[in-house]
From Swiss-Prot:
Belongs to the GTP cyclohydrolase I family. QueF type 1 subfamily. Pathway: tRNA modification; tRNA-queuosine biosynthesis. This is NADPH-dependent 7-cyano-7-deazaguanine reductase. Transmembrane segments: none annotated. It comes from Synechococcus sp. (strain CC9605). The gene is queF.
């Protein structure tokens, strides 16, 4: 029997990074977004990894829509991917979608096996606000 995907599963599967025009393109400002329920799978053990994602960026021409980023990061839930690769991939996708002046993404993974990992990546040059 084929089961129809639940509405949340469909929304995650269809997720794309939706952006809108920067309402203040001439003004330097920063946007800070925290996503405290990020999950993916360890590519070596298959165990789940949990992290808090913290993004700070200075918008260029586009700003990312909040529900879209939530659904996008939820799409990693069942992917087997390293901490380093997932952090860099998310940053690359966000940069491609928004073309920011500057962006930093920090992935603060929960300790597992007495090891705590924080991966921080950035793009561009931070401007004074």
């Amino acid at each position: 029997m084929t089961q129809t995907p639940l509405y949340g599963e469909r929304a995650i599967a269809e997720a794309e990074l939706i952006c809108f025009d920067n309402p203040r393109p001439g003004r330097p400002y920063e946007v800070s977004i925290e996503l405290p329920e990020f999950t993916c799978k360890c590519p070596f053990s298959g165990y789940p990894d949990f992290a808090v994602l913290r993004m700070i960026y200075q918008p260029g021409p586009r700003v990312v829509e909040l529900k879209a980023i939530k659904l996008y990061v939820n799409s990693y839930r069942d992917q087997s991917i390293s901490h380093e690769e997932v952090t860099n991939r998310i940053l690359d996708d966000l940069v491609a979608a928004t073309d920011p002046v500057w962006m930093q993404l920090e992935a603060d993974f929960n300790p597992r096996g007495n090891v705590h990992t924080v991966v921080r990546v950035s793009h561009g040059t931070r401007q004074p606000c």
